[in-house]
């Protein structure tokens, strides 16, 4: 695929490192900003805020603890950024190593960028904690597995029970979206 055929991304994509940048640029025509780890400097946060005001920002970090930490730091400093998520499967290395954007296929990257979420920090919860409990997502023998599958299906990343409520609220996932996802993830034939 030549440069002219690649999907063009207007926003700046925030990634963790230079290998992530290389992989993103194989998949799409986009500018990136690298955090160079989870200890994000005030200068980098200022750059992200400036880019958000001028072009918009997409946070695209690894589906691991460090990636979630970076995502949280940026979200708190610059509310309203967009988020792209890879599944752990899509970010797995072919041999040894840790999960990372740098291991994802161009197709997986384009798919993640096609399903962006924008935070609504002050949004009203559309789904209650009780809804999550009744669905078996916060307790019970299958809760962890159901949350993993739900995170993959909705492309919002893996969360624990408490984080799930916050993330569904943050991204304004509707009861209908949750119901459709639950029907899919609880069908063992899909996994």
Swiss-Prot record:
PROSITE patterns reported in the protein's UniProt record: TOPRIM
Keyword RNA-binding: yes
The protein's enzyme class: hydrolase
Binding site for Mg(2+) 2: 62, 64
Record-listed Mg(2+) 1 binding positions: 16, 62
Catalysed reaction equations from the record: Endonucleolytic cleavage of RNA, removing 21 and 42 nucleotides, respectively, from the 5'- and 3'-termini of a 5S-rRNA precursor
GO-annotated molecular function: metal ion binding; ribonuclease M5 activity; rRNA binding
Gene Ontology annotations for the cellular component aspect, listed alphabetically: cytoplasm
One of the GO biological process terms: rRNA processing
Localization per record: Cytoplasm
Protein function: Required for correct processing of both the 5' and 3' ends of 5S rRNA precursor. Cleaves both sides of a double-stranded region yielding mature 5S rRNA in one step.
Family the UniProt entry places it in: Belongs to the ribonuclease M5 family.
The protein's name in its UniProt record: Ribonuclease M5 1
Gene that this polypeptide is encoded by: rnmV1
């Amino acid at each position: 695929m030549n440069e002219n055929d690649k999907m063009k991304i207007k926003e700046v994509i925030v990634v963790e490192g230079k290998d992530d940048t290389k992989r993103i640029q194989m998949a799409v025509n986009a500018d990136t900003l690298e955090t160079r780890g989870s200890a994000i400097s005030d200068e980098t946060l200022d750059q992200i805020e400036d880019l958000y005001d001028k072009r918009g920002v997409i946070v695209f970090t690894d589906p691991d603890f460090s990636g979630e930490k970076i995502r949280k730091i940026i979200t708190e400093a610059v509310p309203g950024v967009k988020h792209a998520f890879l599944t752990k499967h899509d970010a797995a290395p072919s041999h040894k190593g840790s999960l990372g954007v740098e291991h994802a296929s161009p197709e997986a990257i384009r798919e993640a960028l096609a399903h962006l979420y924008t935070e609504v920090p002050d949004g009203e919860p559309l789904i209650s904690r009780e809804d999550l409990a009744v669905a078996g997502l916060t307790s019970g023998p299958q809760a962890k597995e159901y949350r993993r599958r739900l995170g993959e299906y909705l492309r919002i990343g893996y969360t624990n029970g408490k984080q799930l409520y916050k993330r569904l609220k943050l991204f304004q996932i509707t009861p209908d979206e949750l119901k459709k996802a639950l029907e899919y993830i609880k069908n063992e034939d899909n996994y």
